[in-house]
Amino acid sequence: MTNYRTESDSFGEIQIEDKFYWGAQTQRSLENFKIGKQRMPEILIRSLAILKKCAAKVNLEFGDLEPKIAESIDKATSRILNAEFSDNFPLVVWQTGSGTQTNMNMNEVIASIANEELTGMKGGKSPVHPNDHVNKGQSSNDSFPTAMHIATVLATREKLIPALNNLLTALQNKSKDWDSIIKIGRTHLQDATPLTLKQEFSGYITQIEYALERIEDALKKVYLLAQGGTAVGTGINSRKGFDIKFAEEVAEFTKQPFKTAPNKFESLAAHDALVEFSGTLNTIAVSLMKIANDIRLLGSGPRCGLGELHLPENEPGSSIMPGKVNPTQVEALTMVCTQVMGNHVTVTIAGSNGHLELNVFKPVIIYNILQSIELLSDAANSFVTHCVDGIEPNITHINDLRDKSLMLVTALNPHIGYDNAAKIAKEAHKHGITLKEAAKKLNLLSEEEFNKIVVPEKMVRQS
């Protein structure tokens, strides 16, 4: 038999299954917003718990909370951070655009845990009240955006940066011995002048290095916290100096350089910092899409494609074509990239719709940003483990393609001029002969002169 308890809010009483710790406002949200299954991300819940812990500590320092109340809030948030109550945060993203119901979900659960410890009974509003104590000096309008920023920083530090560093190291290690492998370059998907395989991969390496730099630049504004602005940015019902001390507590707890935002009106009404950060994630997706597609093309084949790289064979690729193996890690990564690009469109539209004193698209903004961080992180790590680490060059085929390329003729430009070099290339292509044979046939160069000038090893460096 299911046991229920009665909770209440300004709308009256409501029944809640007694095994859960949330209160009336959370229950109403569950009943009023049966939309989708996209729950608030775990790291956002963790960030809200950090927020409430730090707020209680500051309120205690100011003398605005009794020690017994502050201590009970601190213990409750520690238990939440220890994942003891993960099933008590059930609300979906599709709720009020300020995130008020998730903020109250956290307030109610903390108060309920604290009350159970102090009285033996979960729920209720005494001795710990979800609004008067847990939410003291706060509004959902400043708390939720603060949690959004904390969650973005933590997810980036814990997942995305390590994943990109993992990919960077893998690309560096894989290509470090490829400086002697000279291959044909391609522009417009047509043959171009030679370069080394290491040089080609150095472009990918630099893209990832720049991605890491972009993240650090974009995080600078995300470190600024809205807490202390309360309802519309004026700080009503929040003690002077609360915002500064709060940011210091969060910085100490997370070991991240959080500071209070200098203008709380901007912090509540706009989410430009997160739109910018989403733009950085979008740029990273663009970079990874280019890298993955290049590796896909270079590994195409095995017999009728470019075939310059051997990609790891991880699983059967076709239900009808025996022996077929596909570049599945590339396909997974590029699908992730398209999702991240789409997420950025959502964040852009949501960020542009901050009306007057409050942007009310907060949940969808943070949901998409955190999803982008998670997908990019997981996909980068998977790409390293199941693709990059196992890539090997097909040296024989690389050499064969290079030596057949007509674009080696570019080395002749300084010696016989562009027009004569073009004649050699066209003659070779028209009659299916080598550049050397065409040069001799047209009486433009002797074999000895040709061999002295057209040296692929010399074409991959500036003279």
From Swiss-Prot:
Among the Pfam families in the record, one is Lyase_1
Reactions mediated catalytically: (S)-malate = fumarate + H2O
Which leading EC class covers this enzyme?
lyase
**EC number assigned by the record:** 4.2.1.2
Site Important for catalytic activity: give positions. Answer: 331
Q: Where in the cell is it found?
A: Cytoplasm
Q: GO molecular function: any one?
A: fumarate hydratase activity
GO:BP terms for this protein?
A: fumarate metabolic process; malate metabolic process; tricarboxylic acid cycle
Source organism superkingdom? Bacteria
The principal localisation class reads cytoplasm
Identify the pathway.
Carbohydrate metabolism; tricarboxylic acid cycle; (S)-malate from fumarate: step 1/1
A GO CC annotation recorded here is:
cytoplasm
Q: Which NCBIfam families match?
A: fumC_II, PRK12273.1
Q: What is this protein called?
A: Fumarate hydratase class II
